[in-house]
């Protein structure tokens, strides 16, 4: 099970840390709570691979996000790169992520490994 622990929020972005059990994987970037496409609510969500037109391949989507659809985990560096999705990378510079594509590839491999081992994978957002 993946766990996303949010550690900082302001009016421009939300920063978190993503874990596999208790093992730190990466940092995350989401929009703030009070915008047109806010970060998702705290809760546990099943992850399913679905085709993404934006990325041209199957991507990890979060299911049953309180009526919202299209919420996925994907690479990106800045708040403008997300419309409610969870971006992954390294939070080295305030308000942004770096090394996002390589980090996504690592996280994606972990999600696929969990899915292959357990038949399902969830993420708990706190």
Residue ranges: model-predicted function:
Residues 1-121, 126:
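Cell wall/extracellular polymer interaction/catalysis modules
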